[in-house]
Every structure is written in structure tokens, then in C-alpha cells.
């Protein structure tokens, strides 16, 4: 994280829930941002938390903001051209600035840059502002399972993919890439078993490869039963990045398409086709072909 303290909306946190007070700086190309963007849409918080879009790095090498015309320029709400300018107002900031970044417009400071915290807090602390019929992304009766999935997906898949595609150390990149592919084997096997498909990637896997038992026993059509949860969001955005360009940068050449894992592919395509899971900004950034 780029800030020393990432504040929380939880009961033990210090941020008040207030529509219109915060602004999310995000990029559709970033899987960490897409976590928050998906939750924001699914929960009906698009008006309560407006977005300032970044489409890439500027002359300073950091995320640049956009003007009213959608071109690089001064963001009218934040009064800055570069995200670095916003972070520089924030106590405890250490470069480089990162996205997503939640800005408190009353102070102009970044109050959270942790996508996992934002996903969880929007799901559990912003209840009063959720749309009618919004999904419960972190149901209490599944919390042990979502916690277990979040921990395993975070290290095995999310961080693994980032290291595989960005590390300058060939050995670290190769080890991380192998971990992601084994992780896909595990998830494909568990989804196949739960949905009565043939577990085509089961050979060679051990219990040590998978998540905790509290995650395994919950799996159904989705990771924690018959409805998507925050854990599905965490996995989905990395699978997106993998499928739409990331796999081409894996060590040793292009890694297999997600279709190599039939049950995982079915899970992914089902979510990709659901309303709210892919917004126009993400679709443009990823080059997705599905409407």
C-alpha cells in the first residue's frame, strides 16, 4: 500500500458512511480496481461513490487523471492531473501511488488504497445505501468459507498472477506462474466435483494444493454455494486478466486459455455474462468481446 494507514468503514473503523463524500480513482485495466468496481455496481453504489477514471501512466510515470472530456487532464472533482498529486496530500504516503484509491473529498486525501478492504467494507458496512435486492457478498453464515477462499485466492492466484507477469526475477516469475496454474487445477477440480462434471485436472493434486476445508465444503455452482460472493469477485478479476492478455506474458511462452479448465471456464463465462460483472470501461480496457 502507498499510504501508512488504510482507513476502514467497519464498526471498528474511523470512516463515516456518507453518499457523495468519497471518490474512487480506478482503472478498468487493473484487476484490483475491478474488484471494487464490480461490488460498487452490484450493490447499487454507483451514485453514492462516483469514479474518476485513469487510463494509464502520465509524464511523471504515475497514474494520470482525466478531464471532463475524458482525455488526460485535470480531474474537475479532485483538482489534480496526476494521482501522485492527490497522494501527496495524504499523511504517511510512500511512492508510488496505486489504484484503486478512495479519496475523501472533504480533505482531498486518500483514505483507502486496499482493494480487499474496500470490497469487504462496501459489502458489509454500506448496507443502508445498498439498492433493494442487492446481493449479500459476505453472508455471515458463509464467513468462514469466504475468509478461507479469500486468503488462498489472494496468495495463490491474485499475487501469483501479478508476480508471474511483472517480476524481473525469472525464477520467481516461473514459480508464481506454476502456482497459478496449479491453483486453476484445484478450482477446476472442486467446481467439477460440485457440479457433477468430470474432474479433468484432478490427477497429481494433493490436499496441500488446495484451500482450507472450510472453503472446500462450501463450493457449489460458485465458490461458496449457489450464489456468487466476494470470493468469486476476487478470483474473477484475476482470471479476466489472465484470459485477456496476461497469459501471453507467462514465463516460457503463452499459457493455456481458460478453456483448458472446463469447470473453471464455465464458472467464468457464467459470471462474465451476468449483469454488473463487466462494465464498459473494463470491457474497453481488456478488449473483451462479450457484450
Regions found by a protein language model. Name each.
Residues 1-291:
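C-terminal alpha-helical interaction module
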Amino acid at each position: 500500500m502507498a499510504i501508512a494507514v488504510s482507513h476502514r468503514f467497519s464498526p471498528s473503523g474511523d470512516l463515516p458512511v456518507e453518499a457523495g463524500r468519497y471518490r474512487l480513482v480506478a482503472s478498468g485495466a487493473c484487476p484490483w480496481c475491478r474488484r471494487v468496481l464490480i461490488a460498487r455496481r452490484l450493490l447499487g453504489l454507483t451514485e453514492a461513490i462516483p469514479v474518476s477514471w485513469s487510463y494509464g501512466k502520465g509524464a511523471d510515470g504515475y497514474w494520470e487523471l482525466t478531464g471532463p472530456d475524458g482525455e488526460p487532464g485535470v480531474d474537475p472533482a479532485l483538482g489534480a492531473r496526476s494521482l501522485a498529486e492527490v497522494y501527496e496530500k495524504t499523511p504517511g504516503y510512500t511512492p508510488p501511488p496505486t489504484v484503486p484509491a478512495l479519496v475523501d473529498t472533504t480533505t482531498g486525501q486518500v483514505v483507502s488504497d486496499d482493494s480487499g478492504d474496500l470490497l469487504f467494507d462496501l459489502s458489509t458496512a454500506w448496507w443502508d445505501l445498498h439498492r433493494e435486492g442487492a446481493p449479500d457478498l459476505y453472508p455471515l453464515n458463509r464467513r468462514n468459507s469466504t475468509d478461507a477462499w479469500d486468503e488462498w485466492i489472494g496468495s495463490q492466484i491474485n499475487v501469483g498472477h501479478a508476480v508471474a507477469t511483472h517480476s524481473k526475477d525469472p525464477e520467481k516469475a516461473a514459480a508464481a506462474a506454476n502456482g497459478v496454474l496449479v491453483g486453476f487445477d484445484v478450482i477446476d477440480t472442486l467446481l467439477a466435483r460440485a457440479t457433477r462434471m468430470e474432474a479433468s485436472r484432478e490427477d497429481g493434486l494433493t490436499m496441500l494444493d488446495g484451500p482450507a476445508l472450510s472453503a472446500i465444503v462450501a463450493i457449489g455452482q460458485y465458490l461458496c454455494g449457489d450464489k456468487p460472493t466476494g470470493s468469486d469477485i476476487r478470483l474473477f478479476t484475476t482470471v479476466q486478466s489472465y484470459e485477456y492478455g496476461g497469459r501471453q506474458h507467462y514465463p516460457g511462452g503463452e499459457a493455456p486459455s481458460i478453456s483448458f479448465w472446463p469447470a473453471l471456464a464455465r464458472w467464468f463465462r457464467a459470471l462474465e455474462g451476468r449483469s454488473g460483472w463487466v462494465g464498459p470501461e473494463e470491457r474497453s480496457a481488456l478488449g473483451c468481446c462479450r457484450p
